[in-house]
Amino acid sequence: MSLNSAEKAEIINEYKRGDKDTGSPEVQVSLITSRIKYLTDHFKENKKDFHSRRGLQELVNKRRKLLKYLKRNDQDRYQTLIQNLGLRDSY
């Protein structure tokens, strides 16, 4: 896996909405984005790793669905999240 517990805790603390928040869309999208970044670096060295490529596609789709949900329900939180993560507004 790409993230250890300390890195996950750091990301969760940055994007959490409450004290024990680990499931808000912001936290989920930020964790998925860090895994996507790790996998894209992984594919630069391992071009034939097609099994992980399928996992990457699943992560991208999951992030897309979460961002679409967040945009539909709270536009302000969506805008701040994509600005913080450096994503395009294409959802």
From Swiss-Prot:
Keyword list, A-Z: Ribonucleoprotein, Ribosomal protein, RNA-binding, rRNA-binding
One Pfam family from the record: Ribosomal_S15
Source species, domain of life: Bacteria
Signal peptide extent: none
GO cellular component: cytosolic small ribosomal subunit
UniProt keyword Ribonucleoprotein, yes or no: yes
Record flagged with keyword rRNA-binding: yes
Any one GO biological process: translation
GO MF annotation list: rRNA binding; structural constituent of ribosome
Subunit structure: Part of the 30S ribosomal subunit. Forms a bridge to the 50S subunit in the 70S ribosome, contacting the 23S rRNA.
Assigned protein family: Belongs to the universal ribosomal protein uS15 family.
Known role: One of the primary rRNA binding proteins, it binds directly to 16S rRNA where it helps nucleate assembly of the platform of the 30S subunit by binding and bridging several RNA helices of the 16S rRNA.
PANTHER family assigned to the protein according to its UniProt record, in alphabetical order: RIBOSOMAL PROTEIN S15, BACTERIAL AND ORGANELLAR, SMALL RIBOSOMAL SUBUNIT PROTEIN US15M
Name of the protein: Small ribosomal subunit protein uS15
Organism: Legionella pneumophila subsp. pneumophila (strain Philadelphia 1 / ATCC 33152 / DSM 7513)
